[in-house]
Amino acid sequence: MTPRRKAIILVSCCLSLLIVSMDATIVNVAIPSIRADLSASPAQMQWVVDIYTLVLASLLMLSGATGDRFGRRRLFQIGLTVFALGSLACSLAPTIDTLIGARFLQGVGGSMLNPVALSIISQIFTKPVERARALGIWGGVTGISMAAGPIVGGLLIETVGWRSVFWINLPICAAAIILTAVFVPESKSQTMRNVDPIGQGLGILFLFGTVFTLIEGPVLGWTNPRVLAIAAVAVVALIAFLRFESRRHDPFLDLRFFRSIPFTTATINAISAFAAWGAFLFMMSLYLQGERGFSAMQTGLIYLPIALGALFCSPLSGRLVGRYGARPSLVAAGILITTAATLLTLLTATTPVWHLLIVFAVFGVGFSMVNAPITNAAVSGMPLDRAGAASAVTSTSRQVGVSIGVALCGSVAGAAMAGSGTDFATAARPLWFVCIALGLVILAVGFFSTSQRAVRSAERLAPLVAGAPDPVNGAHVR
């Protein structure tokens, strides 16, 4: 395969990452405009964000297995098409309920993109050096999309309207579909994994039940029969999931992974960091445009330090992990996220913009330091043929974290969610204390995850899971 064709394949894969990553920051900037135009309640606005991330979390691992079985290029093209249709439906949504349904469709399409694109990259770039370079470019696109998202979103919302933040996905999807059809070869795994529909279904029940309880509990009342019933379903689903998966030969989630302390702590850190991230983005959009009266464009500019932190500090974090291990980056991330959340407790209706920019910069740098050590710790000590599966679990954990973070906005800061006014900052303060706790978890786990005991636990796990089927490696390309 020629270098030119490989480069075009990488571009088509990166386009999928661009739309999925940019969607997070763009939609958060649009939340106040959507709320005003569609007369949405606070809980409905949480669902606009959470239905997308929940579907991503629920289907990421299944999409990887499906691509292995039926063809990665085929599933990638289907994912792009479904994501484009979901984006079109979002842009035309006449009601908030229709928008939530369209976001569900968007999430289904998005779940087929990044895991399959990574698998395509792994099969096309076979030499270690070129694969590392390709994955470095892939990681850089995340920073670029985060940097572009708030600015592009703010500009589009201010000049065209909030519906345009979904229109922008359509030409990108079209370009990716054409490039994939022309240049990407079909590939399938030599080892077909069995699909685990029962485990998958129980996991989905648990995730949706938990988030429903957190979002609707403050609205309907924590003792409301429907809230209690769905909370009970979530608990039963979790218990059944753990029992079923522990007995299955080829489970949806290999619970033995959690015998590795580095893997377990990586999962905890992924959920903690991304819960803080989801809560921060969602609540600050309401604060900036509702409490402070900033325009969507001004809000996008205030978000910029976060994106710049990701763009410039993510590569630094990767180098630190490569040279010194996960601990320095995790400790730095924990300290910075905790510091940013502490500064957020001081917010008022008249906090100077320079103070906000400092908070966003500190949070952005802290958040950018956490991704590389999470991935590194997740695969630490894992056999090569299980690294993809371990990494997929942490990718899912990231989306679970965002869903929980957004859901907590209503549970912990319901008064602030109910409307703007001079009490917004005060009502939101409990949420920032939760973010402080999440930052401290990252800090504490950062020390523990790299201890000698942790290393030994990973070494003991490796022979137990070696040779099990993995969704990433061993493809036949035709």
Language model: regions and residue ranges:
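A residue-level signal for alpha-helical anchor/packing sites in multi-pass solute transporters
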Residues: 120, 124, 155, 183, ...
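C-terminal membrane-cytosol helix-exit motif in multi-pass small-molecule transporters
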Residues: 170-189, 204-216, 233-248, 442-452
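Flexible interhelical linker loops that connect adjacent transmembrane helices
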Residues: 177-204, 246-261, 322-323, 385, ...
